[in-house]
From Swiss-Prot:
ATP binds at G9, P10, S11, G12, A13, G14, K15, D16. Keywords: ATP-binding, Nucleotide-binding, Transferase. It comes from the Bacteria. The gene is phnN. PANTHER family: GUANYLATE KINASE-RELATED, RIBOSE 1,5-BISPHOSPHATE PHOSPHOKINASE PHNN. The keyword Nucleotide-binding applies. The keyword NAD does not apply. The lineage of its organism: Bacteria, Pseudomonadati, Pseudomonadota, Gammaproteobacteria, Enterobacterales. Belongs to the ribose 1,5-bisphosphokinase family. SUPFAM superfamilies: P-loop containing nucleoside triphosphate hydrolases (SSF52540). This is Ribose 1,5-bisphosphate phosphokinase PhnN. Transmembrane segments: none annotated. GO terms for cellular component: cytosol. Pathway: Metabolic intermediate biosynthesis; 5-phospho-alpha-D-ribose 1-diphosphate biosynthesis; 5-phospho-alpha-D-ribose 1-diphosphate from D-ribose 5-phosphate (route II): step 3/3. Catalyzes the phosphorylation of ribose 1,5-bisphosphate to 5-phospho-D-ribosyl alpha-1-diphosphate (PRPP).
Amino acid sequence: MTKLIYLIGPSGAGKDSLLRAIRQLSLPHLLVAHRYITRPAEIQGENHIALTPEEFAIRQQLGIFALNWQAHQCHYGIGIEIDYWLQRGSDVIVNGSRAYLTQARERYGNTLFPICLTVSESALRQRLRARGRESEQQIAMRLQRAEEEQNRLQSDCVLLNNDGDLQHTLSTFQSLLPLDRACTAHRE
């Protein structure tokens, strides 16, 4: 059975870095989906398709998104192509939203495999400051939200710590594959 790996975690936890590393592995059975976001693309940021709010609204009205949500004054969407990929037998990984996990679960049921990328508060603060996107007040708000969301995670979310070396996190992620045999057995 194919799986939709729903990667979640606070901003700055390293989701984009992990997705880039997974993409570089070129695993034949795992496709990395991109997101559509109403913010400009960044050189070091997430590999996404930048849309204006108007473009996003048109695509949303046309039903082009399998999943979509709003956070941090932006709209986010995952294209319906992921449904085709799953139907064709590929596992798919998406950069999801912690707040939208319940809706994703409703749409995908047992196909959904949520992984929460965790990181210590000190590492998260350091990463948020280093990327330079947020003010100190925004960083404080993101740290508070990260703690609140961590406390609300569903028990079926696999926790994947990313405090250390990205290669270690990538190896731990790979140990979860093949997903049909490992998806409920691993919790770090």
